[in-house]
Amino acid sequence: MAQSVPPGDINTQPGSKIVFNAPYDDKHTYHIKITNAGGRRIGWAIKTTNMRRLGVDPPCGVLDPKESVLMAVSCDTFNAATEDLNNDRITIEWTNTPDGAAKQFRREWFQGDGMVRRKNLPIEYNL
């Protein structure tokens, strides 16, 4: 069963952080490439610490081994002088899909007893 094997690695471009540059009176969009570097199909989902300011599209999906997806992270307008800009990040969670599952994302893959891995990408705001 796929759930007894830990999920393999993913690669992201950028690899360690996302940077948004001022001015923040217009919406910014940054693209992230996620690649399934492992040997099994995975389901992945994105979480953000600030859903009011940060959006992701698509927010989840399924990747076969060595397959990639381009994801957009958008930063809505905000007032940099009055907003707390610390500790924003997106988190990519991924898990193996069950053997024989269709290539369609299902939230319950993350709610069972299978291992879920996480990668955090901090958000940096250049003023």
From Swiss-Prot:
Residues 9-126 form the MSP domain. InterPro entries: Ig-like_fold (IPR013783), MSP_dom (IPR000535), Nematode_MSP (IPR051155), PapD-like_sf (IPR008962). It comes from the Eukaryota. Pfam families: Motile_Sperm (PF00635). Gene3D superfamilies: Immunoglobulins (2.60.40.10). The modification N-acetylalanine is found at residue 2. Keywords: Acetylation, Cell projection, Cytoplasm, Cytoskeleton. Sperm. One of its GO terms (cellular component) is cytoplasm. GO terms for molecular function: identical protein binding. It is found in: Cell projection, Pseudopodium; Cytoplasm, Cytoskeleton. The keyword Acetylation applies. Central component in molecular interactions underlying sperm crawling. Forms an extensive filament system that extends from sperm villipoda, along the leading edge of the pseudopod. Forms filaments 10 nm wide, with a characteristic substructure repeating axially at 9 nm. This is Major sperm protein isoform beta. It comes from Ascaris suum (Pig roundworm).
